[in-house]
Swiss-Prot record:
Transmembrane domains' residue ranges: none
Originating species: Burkholderia vietnamiensis (strain G4 / LMG 22486) (Burkholderia cepacia (strain R1808))
InterPro entries for the chain: YbaB-like_sf, YbaB/EbfC
Keywords of the record: Cytoplasm, DNA-binding
Broad class of where this protein is predominantly found: cytoplasm
GO cellular component assignments: bacterial nucleoid; cytosol
Location relative to the cell: Cytoplasm, Nucleoid
HAMAP family: DNA_YbaB_EbfC
Entry protein name: Nucleoid-associated protein Bcep1808_1753
Composition skew (Pro residues), residue ranges: 99-108
Biased composition (Polar residues): 85-95
Length: 108
């Protein structure tokens, strides 16, 4: 009986690994947009943290360089937070049946 349970667990683990791979491929296609300065700076990235686009309103180009750098950093950080939240939401469906501790983050 123990062998049967172990085989079942191994099969479950293999299926979950395949599902995780598919989910990673999907997350690589999902884009999120971070903004700062009331939308004057926008960073678009995938849920795998690959930046696709950076858009800067032309009105900022003549302004203070330090302020522009801060706005770009803030937009990037906003995009990262959105990517993490989207990834967590998508992954929660896959891990809902697993006995994981609260707040446990998978390493992807």
């Amino acid at each position: 009986m123990l062998k049967g349970n172990l085989a079942g667990l191994m099969k479950q683990a293999q299926q979950m690994q395949e599902n995780m791979k598919k989910m990673q491929e999907q997350l690589a296609q999902i884009e999120v947009e971070g903004q700062s300065g009331a939308g004057l700076v926008k960073v678009t990235m995938t849920c795998r943290n690959e930046v696709r686009r950076v858009a800067i309103d032309p009105s900022l180009l003549a302004d203070d360089k330090d302020m522009l750098e801060d706005l770009v950093a803030a937009a990037f950080n906003d995009a990262v937070r959105k990517a993490e939240a989207t990834s967590q939401e998508k992954m929660s469906g896959m891990t809902s049946g697993l006995p994981l501790p609260p707040g446990f983050k998978l390493p992807f």
